[in-house]
Amino acid sequence: MTAEVTAADAEVLLAQPRGFCAGVDRAIDIVERALELHGAPIYVRHEIVHNRYVVEDLRGKGAVFIDELDQAPAGAIVVFSAHGVSQAVRGEAEARGLRVFDATCPLVTKVHIEVARMRAAGREIVMIGHKGHPEVEGTLGQAQGGMYLVETVEDVAALQVSDPGNLAYVTQTTLSVDDAAAVAGALKARFPGIVEPKKSDICYATQNRQDAVKLLAPECDLVLVVGSTNSSNSNRLREVAERKGVAAYLIDGAHAIDPAWLQGRRSIGITAGASAPEVLVQQVVERVRELGAVSVRTMPGLEESVAFPLPKGLSRKIAQTESLE
């Protein structure tokens, strides 16, 4: 042991489930398969998922991350990120002759379909979400007008709509379950006739990881959340732990751990956002062990078995390539 030891004899508790969800797995697979089929460069609009490690790994394999489609040459292969895009972006891609592989999470696509259906029925739509998040921008861009964005209960109180009797609402898929429920409750109280989604828009992985932290936090005196600062669902995990009265930090990886955080801690919880790979979790565990932790235990929890298929166009190309080998 060295003088750096700060978590002497502490136990590490791992949340279950944690880390990659099916939508993130699929999105990364799409970029990697596109690179295998077509070679570099493959252009990706926005970060494929909100994780620095994942983005840098794909960049090293030949992915080029762009903010707007005009940064890709005409006719190039472009991947849309897991967060989804607006109808305007889809139209621009078609107009420029870009070959698109769509990595939009199927659960985000479900919300897009809800928006189209509700607008076709003549309803205005309130979206619960974080302003400026790519998923929110993509969902708001599914309709030309008739949509409103709220983030808080206070936003609901100040909301002015054209037809209060003909409203529906949807939510960003990565919100705090508790916060979204509070805002939805405020919407239903103010607009009693508002139509809600047939099934919650918050995705299974967001729900499961937040539930896991609710079980983890009472057993710990510190929680480390592995995830990037621009990851919505990772930030929500940190907030869930803090609301349970536990100190919590969001970290990109083991290098970000301040040994002082671990001083005197007896039980250190670790989880990871849906866009954070397990390799980063294991590096964090190893670093905490270097700082004095003596045991590692995984909490009981759900074993997820969700998987999403690749886009049909990409699957066909893979099958054609394999048949020629």
UniProtKB/Swiss-Prot annotation:
<keyword id="KW-0414">Isoprene biosynthesis</keyword>
<feature type="binding site">
    <location>
        <position position="275"/>
    </location>
    <ligand>
        <name>dimethylallyl diphosphate</name>
    </ligand>
</feature>
<feature type="binding site">
    <location>
        <position position="232"/>
    </location>
    <ligand>
        <name>dimethylallyl diphosphate</name>
    </ligand>
</feature>
<feature type="active site" description="Proton donor">
    <location>
        <position position="135"/>
    </location>
</feature>
<keyword id="KW-0411">Iron-sulfur</keyword>
<comment type="similarity">
    <text>Belongs to the IspH family.</text>
</comment>
<feature type="binding site">
    <location>
        <position position="231"/>
    </location>
    <ligand>
        <name>(2E)-4-hydroxy-3-methylbut-2-enyl diphosphate</name>
    </ligand>
</feature>
<feature type="binding site">
    <location>
        <position position="173"/>
    </location>
    <ligand>
        <name>(2E)-4-hydroxy-3-methylbut-2-enyl diphosphate</name>
    </ligand>
</feature>
<keyword id="KW-0408">Iron</keyword>
<feature type="binding site">
    <location>
        <position position="233"/>
    </location>
    <ligand>
        <name>(2E)-4-hydroxy-3-methylbut-2-enyl diphosphate</name>
    </ligand>
</feature>
<feature type="binding site">
    <location>
        <position position="203"/>
    </location>
    <ligand>
        <name>[4Fe-4S] cluster</name>
    </ligand>
</feature>
<feature type="binding site">
    <location>
        <position position="83"/>
    </location>
    <ligand>
        <name>(2E)-4-hydroxy-3-methylbut-2-enyl diphosphate</name>
    </ligand>
</feature>
<feature type="binding site">
    <location>
        <position position="50"/>
    </location>
    <ligand>
        <name>(2E)-4-hydroxy-3-methylbut-2-enyl diphosphate</name>
    </ligand>
</feature>
<comment type="pathway">
    <text>Isoprenoid biosynthesis; isopentenyl diphosphate biosynthesis via DXP pathway; isopentenyl diphosphate from 1-deoxy-D-xylulose 5-phosphate: step 6/6.</text>
</comment>
<feature type="binding site">
    <location>
        <position position="133"/>
    </location>
    <ligand>
        <name>dimethylallyl diphosphate</name>
    </ligand>
</feature>
<feature type="binding site">
    <location>
        <position position="105"/>
    </location>
    <ligand>
        <name>[4Fe-4S] cluster</name>
    </ligand>
</feature>
<feature type="binding site">
    <location>
        <position position="233"/>
    </location>
    <ligand>
        <name>dimethylallyl diphosphate</name>
    </ligand>
</feature>
<feature type="binding site">
    <location>
        <position position="50"/>
    </location>
    <ligand>
        <name>isopentenyl diphosphate</name>
    </ligand>
</feature>
<feature type="binding site">
    <location>
        <position position="83"/>
    </location>
    <ligand>
        <name>dimethylallyl diphosphate</name>
    </ligand>
</feature>
<keyword id="KW-0004">4Fe-4S</keyword>
<feature type="binding site">
    <location>
        <position position="50"/>
    </location>
    <ligand>
        <name>dimethylallyl diphosphate</name>
    </ligand>
</feature>
<feature type="binding site">
    <location>
        <position position="133"/>
    </location>
    <ligand>
        <name>(2E)-4-hydroxy-3-methylbut-2-enyl diphosphate</name>
    </ligand>
</feature>
<comment type="pathway">
    <text>Isoprenoid biosynthesis; dimethylallyl diphosphate biosynthesis; dimethylallyl diphosphate from (2E)-4-hydroxy-3-methylbutenyl diphosphate: step 1/1.</text>
</comment>
<protein>
    <recommendedName>
        <fullName>4-hydroxy-3-methylbut-2-enyl diphosphate reductase</fullName>
        <ecNumber>1.17.7.4</ecNumber>
    </recommendedName>
</protein>
<dbReference type="GO" id="GO:0019288">
    <property type="term" value="P:isopentenyl diphosphate biosynthetic process, methylerythritol 4-phosphate pathway"/>
</dbReference>
<feature type="binding site">
    <location>
        <position position="275"/>
    </location>
    <ligand>
        <name>isopentenyl diphosphate</name>
    </ligand>
</feature>
<comment type="function">
    <text>Catalyzes the conversion of 1-hydroxy-2-methyl-2-(E)-butenyl 4-diphosphate (HMBPP) into a mixture of isopentenyl diphosphate (IPP) and dimethylallyl diphosphate (DMAPP). Acts in the terminal step of the DOXP/MEP pathway for isoprenoid precursor biosynthesis.</text>
</comment>
<dbReference type="GO" id="GO:0050992">
    <property type="term" value="P:dimethylallyl diphosphate biosynthetic process"/>
</dbReference>
<feature type="binding site">
    <location>
        <position position="21"/>
    </location>
    <ligand>
        <name>[4Fe-4S] cluster</name>
    </ligand>
</feature>
<feature type="binding site">
    <location>
        <position position="275"/>
    </location>
    <ligand>
        <name>(2E)-4-hydroxy-3-methylbut-2-enyl diphosphate</name>
    </ligand>
</feature>
<feature type="binding site">
    <location>
        <position position="233"/>
    </location>
    <ligand>
        <name>isopentenyl diphosphate</name>
    </ligand>
</feature>
<keyword id="KW-0560">Oxidoreductase</keyword>
<keyword id="KW-0479">Metal-binding</keyword>
<feature type="binding site">
    <location>
        <position position="231"/>
    </location>
    <ligand>
        <name>isopentenyl diphosphate</name>
    </ligand>
</feature>
<feature type="binding site">
    <location>
        <position position="232"/>
    </location>
    <ligand>
        <name>(2E)-4-hydroxy-3-methylbut-2-enyl diphosphate</name>
    </ligand>
</feature>
<feature type="binding site">
    <location>
        <position position="231"/>
    </location>
    <ligand>
        <name>dimethylallyl diphosphate</name>
    </ligand>
</feature>
<dbReference type="GO" id="GO:0051539">
    <property type="term" value="F:4 iron, 4 sulfur cluster binding"/>
</dbReference>
<feature type="binding site">
    <location>
        <position position="83"/>
    </location>
    <ligand>
        <name>isopentenyl diphosphate</name>
    </ligand>
</feature>
<feature type="binding site">
    <location>
        <position position="133"/>
    </location>
    <ligand>
        <name>isopentenyl diphosphate</name>
    </ligand>
</feature>
<feature type="binding site">
    <location>
        <position position="232"/>
    </location>
    <ligand>
        <name>isopentenyl diphosphate</name>
    </ligand>
</feature>
<dbReference type="Pfam" id="PF02401">
    <property type="entry name" value="LYTB"/>
</dbReference>
<dbReference type="InterPro" id="IPR003451">
    <property type="entry name" value="LytB/IspH"/>
</dbReference>
